[in-house]
Curated annotation (Swiss-Prot):
Gene: nasA
The protein's name in its UniProt record: Nitrate transporter
Gene3D superfamilies named among the record's database cross-references: MFS general substrate transporter like domains
High-level lineage: Bacteria, Bacillati, Bacillota, Bacilli, Bacillales
GO cellular component: plasma membrane
Highest taxon listed in the record's lineage: Bacteria
Molecular function in Gene Ontology: nitrate transmembrane transporter activity; nitrite transmembrane transporter activity
Pfam annotation, one family: MFS_1
InterPro entries with a match to the protein in the record: MFS, MFS_dom, MFS_trans_sf, NO3_transporter, NO3_transporter_NarK/NarU-like
Inducing factors: Positively regulated by TnrA under nitrogen-limited conditions.
Transmembrane spans: 19-39, 51-71, 79-99, 105-125, 136-156, 167-187, 217-237, 277-297, 300-320, 333-353, 364-384
Function: May function as a nitrate transporter.
Family: Belongs to the major facilitator superfamily. Nitrate/nitrite porter (TC 2.A.1.8) family.
Amino acid sequence: MKLSELKTSGHPLTLLCSFLYFDVSFMIWVMLGALGVYISQDFGLSPFEKGLVVAVPILSGSVFRIILGILTDRIGPKKTAVIGMLVTMIPLLWGTFGGRSLTELYAIGILLGVAGASFAVALPMASRWYPPHLQGLAMGIAGAGNSGTLFATLFGPRLAEQFGWHIVMGIALIPLLIVFILFVSMAKDSPAQPSPQPLKSYLHVFGQKETWFFCLLYSVTFGGFVGLSSFLSIFFVDQYQLSKIHAGDFVTLCVAAGSFFRPVGGLISDRVGGTKVLSVLFVIVALCMAGVSSLPSLSMVIVLLFVGMMGLGMGNGAVFQLVPQRFRKEIGMVTGIVGAAGGIGGFFLPNILGSLKQMTGTYAIGFITFSCIALLAFALVLAAGYYWRKSWSAESSPADV
């Protein structure tokens, strides 16, 4: 497989637009997490409330992913993406000119979930342009849009320090409008777009064991990635007494590892199979989170989180190398379901960390809990991988799995 095949086997401009749409949407989706230290200071939030505020957009994004996944299969990804970006402008405007109460903040967080649902649109849009042997790479490139978190964590605190967090939400409208114009102008739906089917025809995917295995795996990889991305600023400030800006810088470094290594996870999975890659990555993540639970020095915890986030990011790419091998026709719907599971995992992780900190007075218990969850995922991959390689259709060779 050569990278040049991406140019000849698909539509590079659509792949680029899918990445940009997901990138700017992801930046907006985690905005409350990037600004969480400022928001918690304004509202005087408890550790539990801090976790809840940054987790609300992640949970609502899970619900919206299913909705946008269905729309992607029925009206096409381009129209769905346009609708999603228009709706995303509402909470940004609300946060700029409102957001003066905790109730408003929760409502804004719910609407920001539409930005997180972009995942269920961008990945199928890219996937449908490319053949099976390029799925991991194409999906990994589009999925690398989760690097939008970098912009939120790097620039959000700096801008909030100068102008306040409300203005930062208004500033986020600028890149969204730019991407909106580029997307409308250049993105195209694949001619391989399946014809719309009755809604009931999609229900059978809920009865497939593979759907729920993918959900479990992605709730750990993506849930871990986005959950930590949203919560680490608070962790660094609370545990290591860093300034808000320095905390954001370290979060950016860790997020970069997960974001830019996602395509690598997809690329390696194309060559050796997604289950083999995941089995290694879950062990790495478990070891890193166990190390973080000891609350070592700042330099050591950054190394552990960097490697752990890299493993989670590669795991995201590996999971979505597997999805098209099993669900080619229903990829929009399945992407929405699996993406929703990832969002649910991302909702629970900040709440686990915040709640256990409030209950025990330490973050150690929360991180060791996440380490145990990663080990459970490792066991699931080992159990499922052999069965998948034997039972999936001839369209996917054992090496693809």
